[in-house]
Amino acid sequence: MPSLTSLFSFFALASGAFSATADLSKRESYTSSSTGTSNGYYYSFWTDGQGDITYSNGAAGEYSVTWSGDGNFVAGKGWNPGGSREVTFKGSYNPNGNSYLSVYGWTQNPLIEFYIVEDFGTYNPSSGATKKGTVTSDGSVYDIYTSERVNQPSIEGTATFTQYWSVRQNKRSEGTVTTGNHFNAWKNLGMDLGSFNYMIVATEGYYSSGSADITVS
């Protein structure tokens, strides 16, 4: 007959194992494109199918991604639809090469892909874009740009569309982004948005490597 002590030890171990299983079940990992909801947040993970990329959803607004190789991806958590709000993010962002950390999203009618870039790797994403002006928000000047994309992937399939960019001069990997300040600045420069589709705090990588673990709220 087992002793009370051994029974207690068994149940303690079983309880710990159950807790660990429950914690693991909160993480959903993907290596191919996926969208949906996770713990109260919308998530989007797009990849061109190249390279070695693993995206994982964590508790609440947390996500992580690791990547390497010759591929392109955009991944993160946020809201659907997007819009004017204060977006808070924190965590670790460790790129090696071409990568961005941004508030990222789309509108429709017109079809616009937009970036509020908070940090980036070795390549400034505004390179080759047309500068339209600046806006000061959340403790930094942001440079505003537009660029055109022809026959490229979009939320409406392969399409031609415009990209809007706000690129922060003082890079950071945590803080609060007041998105409405950027949307208003863009509008004042004739850069109209349409109806909001999703908006996420995204990590993007292109022919690079790195890791990120970001929590959004």
Swiss-Prot record:
Pathway(s) of this molecule: Glycan degradation; xylan degradation
Comment on pH dependence: Optimum pH is 5.0.
GH11 domain residues: 29-217
GO cellular component, one term: extracellular region
Domain of life: Eukaryota
Reactions catalysed according to its record: Endohydrolysis of (1->4)-beta-D-xylosidic linkages in xylans
Keywords: Carbohydrate metabolism, Glycosidase, Hydrolase, Polysaccharide degradation, Secreted, Signal, Xylan degradation
Compartments (UniProt record): Secreted
Enzyme class: hydrolase
Gene Ontology terms: biological process: xylan catabolic process
Signal peptide coordinates: 1-27
Pfam family, one: Glyco_hydro_11
Temperature dependence, free-text field: Optimum temperature is 55 degrees Celsius.
Transmembrane segment boundaries: none
Summary of the function given for this chain in its UniProt record: Endo-1,4-beta-xylanase involved in the hydrolysis of xylan, a major structural heterogeneous polysaccharide found in plant biomass representing the second most abundant polysaccharide in the biosphere, after cellulose.
Family: Belongs to the glycosyl hydrolase 11 (cellulase G) family.
Protein name: Endo-1,4-beta-xylanase A
Source species taxonomy: Eukaryota, Fungi, Dikarya, Ascomycota, Pezizomycotina
Name of the gene this protein is made from: xynA
